Regions:
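Hydrophobic alpha-helical transmembrane segments in multi-pass integral membrane proteins
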Residues: 61-66, 126-139
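C-terminal transmembrane helix end/exit motif
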Residues: 22-27, 105-106, 110, 133-162
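Residue-level recognition of pore/gate-forming positions within transmembrane alpha-helices
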Residues: 13-16, 95, 123-127, 146-153
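Helix-loop junctions and terminal segments of transmembrane helices
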Residues: 15-39, 110
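Short membrane-interface helical motifs at transmembrane helix boundaries
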Residues: 60-79
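Membrane-interface junctions at transmembrane-helix termini in multi-pass inner-membrane proteins
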Residues: 35, 93-119
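Interfacial transmembrane-helix starts/ends
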Residues: 41-55, 64-67
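Interfacial/gating helices of multi-pass transporter permease domains
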Residues: 1-15, 84-85
Length: 162
């Protein structure tokens, strides 16, 4: 229904700030990794630093989402929306996982590790199926989004491993 869609949209937009806000970290790492060519030690240091910085930013956002969901929803929507508040941290976790997936994929691309990338279509199909099947309510849908994000992260780590 429209009310549920609106509640999800508000939580989703707020949660996407995690993904959008961490993009510069991933994008800054890409040229640095390419620059270091065959120096695996230096590349790994860049990746670890990017992961640590990403973790700190994401952790801070998730703590805010967990502790103050009602306040955040009210600030950004102008009203209290209980359904949005109840899923904000879940959708935030999903976006956090996608931010780490993005970092992993950009790192692999910068290292020239793109073999097997076509298999990611399986993860897109899996996400669609999960979200279609688990759509009875907004919380269930949000948890399915986390599950699909976890599988995408695991896939990005396994399919493009060195």
């Amino acid at each position: 229904d429209e009310t549920t869609a609106g509640a999800y949209a508000i939580a989703s937009i707020l949660a996407k700030t995690i993904f959008w806000g961490t993009q510069p970290i991933s994008k800054a790492m890409f040229p640095l990794s390419v620059e270091n060519g065959d120096n695996k030690s230096q590349k790994r240091n860049i990746l670890l630093n990017a992961c640590a910085f990403l973790f700190v930013c994401i952790f801070a956002a998730l703590v805010l989402f967990y502790l103050f969901p009602d306040l955040l929803i009210k600030i950004f929507s102008g009203k209290e929306i209980a359904d949005s508040s109840s899923i904000l941290v879940y959708v935030g976790i999903s976006m956090a996982l996608l931010a780490f997936t993005n970092l992993s994929l950009l790192y692999k691309v910068s290292c020239g590790k793109t073999k097997g990338a076509a298999l990611f279509l399986v993860f897109v199909l899996l996400e669609v199926l999960l979200l279609l099947y688990f759509s009875a309510n907004i919380v269930q849908f949000s948890l399915a989004l986390i599950a699909s994000s976890v599988t995408f992260l695991i896939g990005s780590l396994l399919l493009l491993r060195e």
